[in-house]
């Protein structure tokens, strides 16, 4: 029986990176690996942007991707919500149809 995988994507303020990463690394049972990347947000939603971000026209954010079993997604969201109850952390879930290594 195969495990259903999901990709959990989170966008968070960059200043939350250390706490977010530490929270994920400390989870038990441990999670598979994950990826973080600095990104810039564009468009609407500048109400809480800094003056610097308003002048630049983009908001600095952290992008985090986790591919994990479907059964672990809610556990991750619950733990992060307890450690970082932050209204500017946005998340969504996508199906993973296939995953592997090329070599």
Positions of PLM-derived features:
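Positively charged, small/polar-rich N-terminal and surface patches that mediate targeting and assembly
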Residues: 1-103
């Amino acid at each position: 029986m195969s495990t259903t995988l999901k990709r959990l994507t989170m966008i968070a303020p960059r200043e939350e990176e250390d706490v977010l990463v530490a929270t994920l690394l400390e989870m038990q049972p441990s999670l598979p690996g994950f990826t973080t990347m600095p990104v810039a947000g564009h468009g609407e939603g500048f109400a809480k942007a800094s003056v610097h971000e308003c002048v630049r026209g983009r908001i600095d954010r952290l992008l985090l991707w986790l591919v994990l079993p479907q059964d672990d997604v809610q556990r991750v969201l619950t733990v992060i919500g307890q450690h970082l109850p932050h209204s500017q952390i946005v998340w969504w879930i996508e199906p993973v149809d296939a995953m592997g290594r090329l070599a």
